[in-house]
């Protein structure tokens, strides 16, 4: 298949307005090949409130979306940028999320109907996307995996959406469905989340959502199941800070994860048993032998390192014993 660079579209609330104390912004990365792309907000400095959906393959090209929820005091008074990189096509795009009206203008006067923003006519009616559960939710028995069906571009004139769920063609009725009215183009977005059994996903059962709406000529069905293919356990290595960095007040610990199949993996860090937040993971990268690798980098204060804190990189993958492995490092271990 031909390498194709993505198009990047900012998604903003209707008329730049907000409801309540928060606002949700979005970024749509469309029409690229091959995987992966990396998407960050404000070059990674904005990580709280971010929800990035898995990439979806349609007609040979991938589409990925991400949203971030911030306080209405933050945007639009502060700049928020969606940063997208597609290594295969050497593409880097920084898309600033701009309000649709001047910041000084009151976009939606109180007690008045929200005016429609300039948006293309919805010729095709609603679209439906289905997303797999998060891999950590599937592999850790204490967590609750969900398959999600998202219906977008639902007209306010035809707001009723019927969503039915099936597991191996047997209908189930345990999904939780919500409608969101603050979509970026004056439409509705309906999200239906189906709680599933861990083993149902791992054994390859097929999950189907069936969507009907008056604007659709016939119901839309989307199915998903765990892909089949070769499996290989990851090798995990924790690397101490480079000597050149040790003179600084803050430096990096690196977790290198190599040789795994399939690509779905979860990586996080702890220090002295407490969850760390100051880390960044790369996307998974296809290696020359057909397996995948990735890196995770944790920023550490020199003072914490010198106190002898114990840092641990934890990796969740389906081929590992108990689906989990942890590698540790400290100042004494790193010498």
Curated annotation (Swiss-Prot):
Pfam families: C1-set. GO terms for cellular component: immunoglobulin complex, circulating. Transmembrane segments: none annotated. SUPFAM superfamilies: Immunoglobulin. The sequence differs from that of the a allele, from BALB/c mice, at 15% of the positions. InterPro entries: Ig-like_dom, Ig-like_dom_sf, Ig-like_fold, Ig/MHC_CS, Ig_C1-set, Immune_Resp_Modulators. GO terms for biological process: antibacterial humoral response; complement activation, classical pathway. It comes from Mus musculus (Mouse). Residues 6-98, 126-225, 234-330 form the Ig-like domain. Signal peptide: none annotated. Glycans are attached at residue 185. This is Ig gamma-2A chain C region secreted form. It comes from the Eukaryota. CDD domains: IgC1_CH1_IgEG, IgC1_CH3_IgAGD_CH4_IgAEM. The keyword Secreted applies. SMART domains: IGc1. GO terms for molecular function: antigen binding; immunoglobulin receptor binding. Keywords: Glycoprotein, Immunoglobulin domain, Repeat, Secreted.
